[in-house]
Amino acid sequence: MSETSSFKVFSGTNSRYLAEKICASLGCPLGNMNITHFADGEFAVSYEESIRGAHVFLVQSTFPNSDNLMELLLMIDAAKRASAKSIIAVIPYFGWARQDRKDKPRVSIGAKLVADLLSVAGIDRLITMDLHADQIQGFFDIPVDHLYASAVFLPYIESLNLENLVIATPDVGGSKRASTFSKYLGVPLVLCNKTREKANVVATMQIIGDVKDKNVVLVDDIVDTAGTITKAANVMLEAGAKSVRAIASHCVMSDPASFRVQESSLAEMVFTDSIPYAKKCDKVKQLSIADMFAETIRRVVNNESISSQYII
């Protein structure tokens, strides 16, 4: 980095573990910031060093839980009031992204509201990864650098040296993402068509494609309760798959996800570290995205191309 004094990296409570890795990759210290929590549940943010005239990068995933979003908004507000030259929100996991449209009457569009809140608070740029819906980028009137976890997942899949490999998606909605993987690796694509009884409950699932005697890698963006991904794995094995493993960008893993993954037929469940995972599940593995975000920050500071590096 040519001028380390021209930018500073700070972190909210939720993503400090990742921010420390990003700073280690950049070769810069993590900025000193204080978040004070009060007895009534409110909290306040203060920067413990000057950020006047600096490009300020704020690392914080906005969910889970909702306090992380409010914490980020206060970080943005404090940076603006402290005369930062520019404020860049680095949101590895953009919470509320599954609320990206009206899918029935009289419902909120949470992703648009969060975009508005961040914009009004004062960010000049957003760096995020694997949005649940690409069109969320259009909710902002500022530059959005949309990174892809495929940059870390594809080398990992290649390192497994799996024969008779197929890429699969646990639902038709993820076919575009899975298709990118299958084309890059030069292997077949298999789809699962699911129906839901209600939220987080999968009723039926059918396979579109051949998995007999294949090593299957399921590709998804978010694993929440793990109902879909584990059911897909079971259906694949019942159809004659040799092995099934899964990769997903964001490790939400709400209860009873850890139990479901542990008891499932999945060989492993691989995530990025966009969200910390503290629960015990031997099958869960996390690959770090710190170097990818660090390189993106470096390119933003130096006005270099980002898309040429990360979009495949």
What is each residue range found by the language model?
Residues 1-312:
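PRPP-associated nucleotide enzymes
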